[in-house]
Amino acid sequence: MNEPVEAKTMVIEGWVEDYALKNALELYKRDHYKHLIITGLPLVHFEDYVMFPSTAAAAAAVVRKLGFKDSIYEAVIPKTVFIDRTYNTGVATRMIMSKHPDWGRSFNIYSVGVHSRRTHLMFERAFGSDYNIGIIADTDHSFDPEHWWHTSIGFRNVSNEFVAWIYVSAFFHPTYSDFKRKLEIGYYTDSINKERKEEDAFFADSAKSPLEKDSLKDFHGLSWYPIKYKYRVMAKFDLDTVNPVFEMATNTARKPEYRIYGHVIFKIHDTLCKLTVYQNINLKNDPQWGNYLFIPFRDKTNGFTTHAAGRYLDIEKPVSDSVIVDFNKAYNPYCAYADRWSCPLVPIENRLPVAIKAGVKEYK
């Protein structure tokens, strides 16, 4: 299937083989394309041992090796998305293109073989009638397309795609906004999981770990609540910097200087909650941490599934009267891991009347 349209954007399906990537680049240069998007799936099998996080990243590396110098945009679906992946890559591609209205509303998909017809239809469903979408199908070298029924792989590919195309044509009528929302939550979940893996790696590093040296041999990762998007709350932010600097109590004789910077007000479990936000005076000019604010808090899980003395959150300084407070990122004070640390105690006004089943759990 070859039905290209006049366009300056090429979308390459990231699963295609190297010969197709090479052919696509030759066409990209010949027809003077300006923008390149590569779609792909996350590589979830043996992910700790593979070089690339997705098929799009792997394809992009091949494209770079072939001498491509322009920007490459990767439309990769999250690890949490397991169904309707071709349509979801279409939604992910649309999310990229919506950020670049100057690219226009036309593009060509570069695919391989019989799958290209269904890809084209899926992308048309994802983009709607406002976009003009073309398709360029390279030859599938795994079987003879003129005699596809002579081999098992040819028969399987053609028959499967034929049935799938009928299904999409007759029965698949998705709502773009619903799929976009699922992708956004999936990207968020992937980002939190990535941060948690990095945190585990930090704790396992003997040169950096807050754990005692003799505890490292028994460390197999921190324990976390499952990631739940509902614990990423939009809060009202009230700036309040009129109070003087004060010495915050810790579990030791140390008295670090803080000031109240404001308050966040939000609802969780249908309960109105309020937390005071603090600024560390010693860090306010620090290039890494100067733009962050500190929220120590306690909730109904403390002493049961989370650290008895409470947990912490950091947020960037709000630039408006609202801010995201993400309890999935709640972390323990270092005192939860070793007695040698000095940690701020949670002020009494920051005790929540609800259970926050999010973030890190008690270390055992």
Identify the meaning behind each predicted range.
Residues 1-150:
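A structural signal for short, hydrophobic/glycine-enriched beta-strand patches
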Residues 2-33, 180-229, 233, 241-242:
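Start-of-domain marker
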Residues 39, 64-74, 86-89, 96-102, ...:
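Mid-length scaffold segments of soluble, non-membrane domains
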Residues 150-177:
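A transmembrane-helix-recognition feature enriched in membrane-embedded lipid enzymes
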Residues 167-179, 354-363:
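Short, low-complexity, Pro/Ser/Thr/Gly-rich segments in the mature regions of secreted, periplasmic
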Residues 231, 246-249, 322:
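Terminal leader/tail segments of proteins
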Residues 294-331:
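Acidic, glycine-rich flexible loop segments
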Residues 330-364:
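Extended, aromatic/histidine-rich regions of cofactor-dependent oxidoreductases associated
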